[in-house]
Amino acid sequence: MAIQNGLRNRILFLVIFMKFYNREKELNYLKNYVQLEPNSILFVYGPKSSGKSTVMLRVIEELSKKDDLVFFYYDLREYATPTKEEFLEIFFEKGDKKYLLNRFEINLKIFKFGIEEKFDFDNIKLNDVFSKMKESINAVIKDGKKPILIIDELQKLKSIYFNGEGKGDKSLLNELFNLFVHLTKVRHLCHVICLTSDTLFIEEIYRNSTLENTSEYYLIDWLRKESIRNILKEEGFSEEEVDYCLKYLSLPYEISQLINNKKLGLSVEQTIKQWINIERDKILYLISTQKEFEMGKLIDALKLFENKIKVDIKEIIRDNLMDEVKFLIKNEILFYDVMNGIIKPTSVKKWYAIKEVIE
């Protein structure tokens, strides 16, 4: 129930705030993409809180009005580490049909894979799981509709294994990729879209030879400055306030928080200074308490961003700081744009916090 309530809250947030965030480019790309013939797995990636899920949910909201599209949407962010049992509970709904409306989200028309009431989850094999998924997808196609499978934070399934029937345990995630290639590249049956902010996971996928020529990547990055300017002007911020904010804002939630704080009587300078102080203290705590690296080496990695917000991966490799940078990526201080070979802070305000750390 908590999972469904969380999704409902995000939909409500979407309806209220999406008008603020000009994501027409990303929205149109994804709306057009899901209406093409399936031919590859699409990985939608970007910094944490850049709006990936919000854009994807808007795509579902707008296109689910069409009778020829069926969206299977699964959000794994509610779980720190889902178990095998939780995976089955999230992905399947017991009932008398091969695909069923999510009963908690009927208005949005999100579906789940259907499975018969008597099916025994306790003794299910991985091949059985995939057979049931394919049955659901084929049922959608038989009804003259196009299935679209969307998984938010897919990497959370990394730790789940199924018994391999005498051949050792099988990684759910690895086997899912094989299934996704079959559904997209081989049979062109179903779109598969995976959303993630874990760019080390994206790097693994990108380097995985078995997924070569079977995957595409789409970046949903920071908001564009012109979009931020238009939003703030619409909300009644003065030109001076807007110019100040443009130096520091980059993510959608920052805008809504700034708007709320202004209504509560806080100036934009107060709000932004608080943000930077909090981010600075988080970074200092992280690098001073971890035991894996020398603190000086982590500071050296951060110093690469002293005078620029983006650093080419080649510079990091040349300075022999890749392990330290990966640690900072894992802890959401830095973001790795794998497709473009660029490392940058996860947000602009994080960059200013980094600059204070290395002063």
Swiss-Prot record:
One of its GO terms (molecular function) is ATP hydrolysis activity. InterPro entries: AAA+_ATPase (IPR003593), Archaeal_ATPase_domain (IPR051667), ATPase_dom (IPR011579), MJ1010-like_2nd (IPR049081), P-loop_NTPase (IPR027417), WH-like_DNA-bd_sf (IPR036388). CDD domains: AAA (cd00009). Pfam families: ATPase_2 (PF01637), MJ1010-like_2nd (PF21690). The keyword ATP-binding applies. The keyword ATP-binding applies. ATP binds at G46, P47, K48, S49, S50, G51, K52, S53. It comes from the Archaea. Keywords: ATP-binding, Nucleotide-binding. Belongs to the archaeal ATPase family. This is Uncharacterized ATP-binding protein MJ1006. It comes from Methanocaldococcus jannaschii (strain ATCC 43067 / DSM 2661 / JAL-1 / JCM 10045 / NBRC 100440).
